[in-house]
Amino acid sequence: LSKTSSQHTEGSFEGARGTQIFYQTWKPSGKAKAIVVIAHGIGEHGARYAHIAGHLTRFGFTAWALDHRGHGRSGGKRGHVESFDDYLTDVGQMIRIAKDHHPGIKTFLVGYSLGGLIAAYFAEKHPSELDGLIASGPALREKMKVPAVKVFLAKTLSGIMPTFTNNTGLDPNLLSHDKEVVRKYVEDPLVHKVVTARWFTEYRRAQNETMQGAEKLTMPCLIIQGGADGIIDPSATNEFFKKIKSSDKTLKVYEGFYHESMNEVGKESVLGDLDTWLAARI
C-alpha cells in the first residue's frame, strides 16, 4: 500500500429541516481509491476522528466526517433530534456530496458508538448507497441500565416538552485507557454532555429497529468492539452481528479495550485491521 500526504478542507450543507451541517474532508494526494464517510458518537464531533482520517488518506482513501446536528460546529439545539431519521438524511447528503466529488469509486460508512447505530440503521434503510458498513462499539444497548424513572420521564416529556434536557452521564474515563485521549475529550470545548427527552425516545426507537433489521444487511460488514467496553454492552454487538445476513461479515473484538477502540492504547492494530479490510474490498 502506497502512503501519501493529504489535503484537508471544511464545508457545510443544508441538512434535514434546514439545519446547517458542518463537515470536513481529507483527500489523498493521488486519485482516491474509495470514499470513507465517518459518523461520530454522542456529544462529540468529527474532528476527534482527524487522526483516523489522516491515517486513511495515507492508504489512498478519502475521508469525509460530518458533525451531526446538535453537535460540534453544526446547527441545532445541542443533543436534540426531532426524529432519528434526520441523522440519516444528513448522512445521506454527506454521502452524495462525497460521491459527486469522487464518482465511480466505492463508498464505505464507518460509525462510532451513536454513529455506529446511525451507520447500521442507514445501511439497513439505504443499502444501495453503500458498498460496506463498519460499526465500532455501535450504541445498540448501554452497559449501565438506564433507570426506569428516566425512561418514563423521557417518554412522557418527548411529546409535551421534547427539548427538555438531561445529562448523558457518560464517564470520560471509560472511553480509553489512554489518559491523553480522556484529557483532550474533557477539555474539548466542542464536546457536550446533554441529550433531550425527544432524543432519548428516538434513540430507543432506532436501537430496536436496527437490532430487528440486522437481517436486512447483505453488504460487507466489519463490526468492531472493545472487549472491556463499559459504555456499550459488547453482548448486544455480538447479538447484532449474529443476525447480519451478509456472507461477508467480520467481528473483531479487542480484548481489554474500552469503548473507543480506535483511540485506545494499542489502536495501531485496530487501524491496521481497518486498512486491511477496506483494501480487500475495493
Language model region names:
Residues 1-30:
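N-terminal cap/lid segment of alpha/beta-hydrolase-fold proteins
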Residues 33-41:
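Short beta-strand element of the alpha/beta-hydrolase
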Residues 43-45, 72-106, 270:
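Catalytic nucleophile-loop/oxyanion-hole region of alpha/beta-hydrolase
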Residues 48, 53-76:
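Conserved alpha/beta-hydrolase
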Residues 112-196:
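Alpha/beta-hydrolase-fold enzymes
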Residues 217, 223-225, 229:
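Short beta-strand/loop motif that positions the catalytic acidic residue
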Residues 219, 233-242:
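Short alpha-helix in the alpha/beta-hydrolase fold that links the catalytic acid
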Residues 250-282:
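Catalytic active-site module of serine/aspartate enzymes centered on a nucleophile-bearing elbow/loop
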